[in-house]
Structures are given as C-alpha cells and as structure tokens.
From Swiss-Prot:
It is an enzyme of class 6 (ligase). It is found in: Cytoplasm. Its main location: cytoplasm. The lineage of its organism: Archaea, Methanobacteriati, Methanobacteriota, Thermococci, Thermococcales. One of its GO terms (molecular function) is histidine-tRNA ligase activity. This is Histidine--tRNA ligase. It comes from Pyrococcus abyssi (strain GE5 / Orsay). It catalyses: tRNA(His) + L-histidine + ATP = L-histidyl-tRNA(His) + AMP + diphosphate + H(+). The gene is hisS. Gene3D superfamilies: Anticodon-binding domain (3.40.50.800), Bira Bifunctional Protein, Domain 2 (3.30.930.10). The keyword ATP-binding applies.
Length: 431
C-alpha cells in the first residue's frame, strides 16, 4: 500500500464542506473590500524565492531541477509570486492594485500542530500605495476576515521593522536582518535557546538584556507608543512612531481598534518586510501560535526587476484557523452530500430519472440508486449516507400518478403526485 506523503493530508467530504465554508466567508469579505482574485503557478523558478524570502524559508523550499535542467521550486508563499506577476504584466496598470488569492503552499518543515508541508493560505496584496491609509485598509480587512468566521477572541499585534532596524543600530549591530531572524524565532525557542542564540549572534549581556526588554514592550497602543518614544531617539524612529500613531487613529475609524495591540518584538519571518508588520494570535490549548500575518514590503518589486513600487498585504493560515474554529465551536453544522435519494422500484427508472433531474434543476441536492439494489437495501444505503428524504418510485404507485416520499429521520412517509414532487420536497426539507 502506498501511503500519502508525510506532512500532507487527504480531505474527506465532511472536512471539505467546512473548508469551503471558511474559504467562502473570507472570499466574501475580500471582495467587499474591492479585491479581485488571482492565481499564480504552483511552481516558480527557485531564484524568485531565494532573492528575499529569508534564510528559514529558503531552507524549507521544495526545490528541484526539471527535465530541462532548470531550477524550480514549489511556492512557499504567494507574495513573491504575486510580485513577480505584477512585474511581468501589470506595472502600467492603474494603482493601487488590489488582489487576493486562496491557494496551497509548500514548505519542507517538521509537521506539528497547525503546520504541514502542504498548507493553504488566503491572502491579499495591495500594490502601489505607500500611504499609511493603505496599511490601515489591509489591517482592517485582516481583522474583518477573522470576524466573518465568527472568531472574536483574537488580537492583531502590530510591530515595525524600521524600529527594529533602529534598535539594531542602537546595539551597534550591523546585521540587522540576522537579529530580526533571531527575534522572530523567540516564540519557537525556549528561554535558554533564545539567550544562547543571541549570545552566539555576538551580543554581550547588556545587549541581550536590551533585547529582552524590547520584546516585552507590548500592549494597547496608548500604553506602548509613549514607551517607544522614550526608547527611540533618532529622527527616523520618531517619524515611524508618528506613522504608528496615525495608523492606530485610522484603525479606530474602521472600528477594529478593539483587536489592535502594539508589539515591538514582532519581526515576521520574511526578509522582504520593510516597515509595519502584524500577526493574529488566539489564546488556545492546541499549541497553535500565529494564525496569520503580513506587512509592508516596499522593496520587493524592485528586487524582482520592476520599478520601485510600494506594497503591503497579509496571509491567513487556513490550517491554523480551522482547528481554532472547531475548538471554539464556531463552525456551523454542515452537511456534505445529497438531501434526497431517489429509488426506482421495478421498471420505473425512466420516471425516477426524470424526477431526480427535476430536483437537480431546482437546486436540490439529489442522488439516484445506481447499483440495482432492492428497496430495503437501497433505503439502508440512503440511511448510511445521511440522506434526509427518500423518494420511492414504484410501478403500482405510478399507475395512480404518485410516488412515496419517506422522511428517513422521522420514519413518516407521504404519497405525492409526480408533478408535485419538487414543491413537496422543498416543503419537507424546510421543516
């Protein structure tokens, strides 16, 4: 027997109906914000992801040579692919461009709670605006996307790469990206491992203490931003803190400030982020950390050969969100499969087929007996697959112009004229 590949999953109908519900809830919100759907190839040239994705992501690439000797990789995220799409074909398009996607990604990492080697994300990219209003629009959509699924007990933590860069300068660190990578891993490492990583990076005890103090500066904006003003003194940092104040004000206009906190220790794992970054956290007992995140990446498009173009976006981790929704009991009761099962008895398949066809054209999920089972076995099958109504099409009933509709939940049944089947089925399903 051939097993499925480690870190991947099969989704049965009962799981797919839940996933589709989540996808459609998020898709609906994306489109109400004016975003349009795109999809890029699952494979790109490996170089695309090596340029600015970050050391950790590059290590986890599913990369190989194709039969033509070209280096290709399965996408580990969509931002790089969408930026490549923009550079290829849309540099002269009206700005800002607002695109969204729902797609699968691949990373070779150790499977654990909420982490798989194939996983799905729903995200957006807003390309062509460097205004703080664009950041606010994207973060507000980030919040509303989670709210659309019924989730309310979450926090969106906002950090800033500019402030982390200034912090690195204050420590005398030249490799600011290296420091950010370590800070980004802080929640994945034990305290001992984190301190060891900072020491191996070259920080002395004083520097390590400053890092530990920095990552504790988090909370509501009114509490944190004044502390940031005390900590950072450079003009660049002051300008960025002013932008954060402005961002928080705009988010209050969107009526999402209830979910917003500032966390100066957020770095995010991709090297392409340039200023504001953010992630969503839900308190849970499942061992799941961030359920999504994003930020501004103003240099990525230029790195890929385009004209300098600002951009911002986010991705929601579907494999992390759905377990949270299930754990909190927020997914509705959803049924996969047909509501009606039509059973021809004897020489009545022509009428049975006509009935199931009318039901389907009326938008009623219907199936028909295809295996030649006798009535009792056909009813047993209908019960086992969870069908609500069974329509028994018998020759004697047809001589009187009727069929029998049996409610498999209550056991009640009723004779209905053939021409009235669709109306009666709708009535019974709505009871």
């Amino acid at each position: 027997m051939i097993e499925r590949v480690k870190g991947t999953r099969d989704f049965l109908p009962e799981e797919m109906v839940k996933r589709r519900w989540v996808f459609e809830k998020i898709r609906e919100v994306f489109e109400t914000y004016g975003f349009k759907e795109v999809l890029t190839p699952v494979m790109e040239y490996t170089k695309l992801f090596q340029l600015r994705s970050g050391e950790e992501v590059v290590k986890q690439l599913y990369a190989f040579k194709d039969k033509g000797g070209r280096d290709v990789a399965l996408r580990p995220d969509m931002t790089s692919s969408v930026a490549r799409l923009y550079v290829n074909s849309f540099q002269t398009a009206p700005k800002p461009i607002k695109w969204y996607y729902i797609a699968n990604m691949f990373r070779y990492e150790e499977p654990q709670s909420g982490r798989y080697r194939e996983f799905w994300q729903a995200g957006v990219e807003l390309i062509g605006s460097d205004k703080i209003e664009a950041d606010a629009e994207v973060i507000a959509l980030f919040v509303d996307s989670y709210l659309s699924t019924g989730l309310k007990d979450f926090t969106v933590n906002i950090g800033d790469r500019v402030l982390l860069d200034e912090f690195a300068k204050m420590l005398g660190v030249k490799d600011d990206i290296g420091l950010m990578r370590i800070i980004d891993k802080k929640d994945k490492l034990s305290q001992e491992e984190f301190l060891k990583a900072l020491g191996e990076f070259g920080l002395d005890e004083n520097g390590i203490e400053k890092v530990l103090n920095l990552i504790e500066i988090k909370g509501k904006p009114d509490d944190v931003l004044p502390l940031a003003e005390e900590l950072f003194t450079s003009e660049r940092a002051k300008e960025e803190i002013s932008r954060l104040y402005n961002l928080v004000d705009i988010l209050s206009w969107y009526e999402v400030d209830e979910w917003i906190q500032i966390d100066l220790g957020i770095a995010r794992g991709f090297d392409y982020y340039t200023s504001i970054v953010f992630e969503a956290i839900v308190p849970n007992d499942l061992g799941i950390g961030s359920i999504g995140g994003g930020g501004r990446y103003d240099n990525l498009i230029e790195v890929f050969g385009g004209k300098p173009t600002p951009a911002t976006g986010f991705a929601i981790g579907i494999e992390r969100l759905i377990p949270i929704l299930e754990w909190k009991g927020l997914l509705p009761e959803l049924k996969a499969g047909p509501d009606v099962f039509v059973i021809p008895v004897g020489d009545s398949r022509d009428v049975a087929t006509a009935i199931v066809t009318r039901l389907r054209k009326a938008g009623i999920r219907s199936d028909i007996e295809l295996s030649g089972r006798k009535l009792r076995k056909a009813l047993d099958y209908a019960n086992r697959i969870g069908v609500r109504l069974s329509i028994i099409v018998g020759k004697r009933d047809l001589e009187r112009g009727v069929v029998t509709i049996r409610d498999l939940e209550s056991g009640n049944q009723v004779e209905v004229p053939v021409d009235n089947v669709v109306t009666k089925v709708r009535e019974l399903l709505n009871q």
